[in-house]
């Protein structure tokens, strides 16, 4: 079998809103799939920062401490040790809060930003990209990866058509649903929505969104061959279990 570059894209654990069962599945799959030899991409929203959702609010949510969120988010980096981190819209709240409010708030948010980025680097993240539709794109061979910059039922198709290269793929998070779609575009391509690693029942805003009915626990795994071809697939929860295969094999017909 030719050398394969294996990767895992996992996103949307949301700090102290993380689902411990989903994280346990991710860690176990990573060991089965190749451990430290796998390129691990944290796809964003590893922290929730819900108290910054409306800037610096005065409601109950706005009064919540960030400490538990920071602790749980950092534990994810300690345990999974991703090579790449794509900031999500929830991490971007730190930047947004610096654009409004007091100097004290700006300094605090900058301090938190510096701290979580430094912690990610300490845990092995060589690449950290901002939440930015142009600058926040990570490319591994023919596979593009982003946190997510579209909403709604067609979000995966729209982003796939926008980011996937000729014959390649796009993987995104953000929308929390699981999806694998063949793109109708010149040269073909695929787009994947990676699901999430958080607890839907504890995220209060999900109760008012029909789209939350599509949420699913999971992530995306795949590999790239020495010749530049790729394969990617969803790893996700089925009922109360997670099911995956451990072995990967490539086959070339003798006629070639």
Locate predicted features.
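Core catalytic region of metal-dependent phosphoesterases/phosphodiesterases
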Residues: 6-122
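Beta-strand-turn-beta hairpins that frame and shape the catalytic cleft
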Residues: 1-8, 137-144, 227
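Acidic carboxylate-rich catalytic motifs and surrounding loops in phosphoryl-/glycosyl-chemistry enzymes
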Residues: 85-90, 130-134, 233-238
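A generic local structural motif
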Residues: 24-27, 71, 131-133, 137, ...
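Flexible, charged surface loops at secondary-structure boundaries
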Residues: 1-3, 30-36, 78-80, 138-140, ...
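Active-site-proximal loop/helix segment associated with metal-binding centers of metalloenzymes
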Residues: 102-144, 148, 175, 193-201
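Conserved beta-sheet core of the metallophosphoesterase superfamily
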Residues: 143-233
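A short C-terminal boundary segment appended to hydrolase-like catalytic domains
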Residues: 224-256
